């Protein structure tokens, strides 16, 4: 497969056939948001319901179209976590065989600066610090929405997208100036 003049190698694609699954992709960039659509939803004729941060509603397209579809835009501040968890679980209701749900377990794009900021805020949390030390290119999962999705799962398969190569496109400017592909 070729996209943005990049070549992709996909292993195990046969396992994606059948009823739509729950998607949990790594989130390292703006560009990697298209991976589930291009390599999963479109080829298999599936629709995904998305859990997205409410800050994206500043984009009029996402505000208008995203709210007309069964997606959820969550407040990540933690002010109303229980409501957000209920909203994520509700995405599972009424799923057809060709509909799945996508959540980014990390809750944000990975960057070294975000990782180090989290380390500073949680310096007294030994378990989290150990996790940060083990997973050098991941943010720890934010468990509220992910667990709500899993708890309300009626038996759908889980698909994890553990991709690499998009780290250089964590900001919109990287996409425009070609810096993420070494231009």
Residue ranges and their predicted role:
Residues 42, 46, 54-71, 96-183:
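A cross-family acyltransferase "interaction/gating" segment
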Residues 7-11, 36-38, 88-90, 145-147:
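A generic local structural motif
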Residues 14-16, 56, 77, 164:
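Short, solvent-exposed coil/turn elements at secondary-structure transition points
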Residues 1-20:
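N-terminal signal-anchor transmembrane helix
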Residues 81-93:
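A Trp-anchored, charged/polar loop motif used as the substrate-binding/catalytic surface
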Residues 1-2, 21-81:
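Catalytic core of membrane glycerolipid acyltransferases/transacylases, capturing the structured
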